[in-house]
């Protein structure tokens, strides 16, 4: 997710080990000259783009600079303003406390811990690595297992791979509703060690193993609702696990670009990226809370998220900002879809060990992750039955 500020990258970073795929639609004159480092077009703000090498991408992330990599986007020159923003009215109150009460009791910290320990055992989940494919395959199997164990497969609940030109695929699980109006919950499955991405370990426990297993647990429990799994909800629910977030939101961009082109009716998207670290907050003497992002998000959906947290979590929220293109919700916003993002704490108190070998499970709070799981489950259920 966010970038970690570290020093002296230039002195230690080697040339990139693997060249990224160049989109076939890039004009010949814009392709890199043979023998020179491959260049990528990144977008650092609504109207700001730049050509960089892969090593320069990682240097920017180390300096705390986030971006879209739009090299492979056919309409890469478009401004975010060119996609008309979808206007959605979200509920003014939460209404399903009775139905959600028994479901919330089924959320399991042990499940999240067990899944996260295994997920972080892969050497790296770097999007162009062999172990990145292996970790995605394992995650896909866990989603499949949740569907089979709940009996939801007989009601057309399904999980699919969304393939990319790099190795690691994204994952989309769909719970059909009575309409094609769709609510998306997302997290990114890849990890990165910014010092040597293709070589060094990248456990990525918090970034974003925590979000990955948080929404997996919410998905598992949501399928215990007969009304949901049998398709009686008003709206379709999708759970996404994105590839290649760390490389410039590549996986989520590809998905929401496809949704835009095919006319998908996406009513809301919630991102869960980094859900487990509280040490920064508690050491500062502050109250444990979740961080509601307020910049580059949909205001109406963000107000609804506040209602969900107040209604279903046992800790408060704080308002905070993370900047442009700081996680995959930005891809939904880029294509006009309402998006929101909730992180583990106020942004300045979030985990500073990400993108290194130090992003490990032992530093995380599963009690805190349970709060994010409660919020995610309640968000999905409330909007599944809402008139949007």
Swiss-Prot record:
Q: Which SUPFAM superfamilies match?
A: Zn-dependent exopeptidases
The primary site where this protein sits is: secreted
Q: Which family does it belong to?
A: Belongs to the peptidase M28 family. M28E subfamily.
Q: Which organism is it from?
A: Coccidioides posadasii (strain C735)
Enzyme class, spelled out: hydrolase
Disulphide bond pairs = 322-326
Q: GO CC: one term?
A: extracellular region
| One example of a Gene Ontology biological process annotation | proteolysis
Domain of life where this protein originates: Eukaryota
What EC number is given for this enzyme? 3.4.11.-
**Cofactor note (record):** Binds 2 Zn(2+) ions per subunit.
Q: Report the locations given in the UniProt record.
A: Secreted
Protein's recorded name? Leucine aminopeptidase 1
Q: Which residues form the signal peptide?
A: 1-19
Residues modified by glycosylation: 180
Q: What does this protein do?
A: Extracellular aminopeptidase that allows assimilation of proteinaceous substrates.
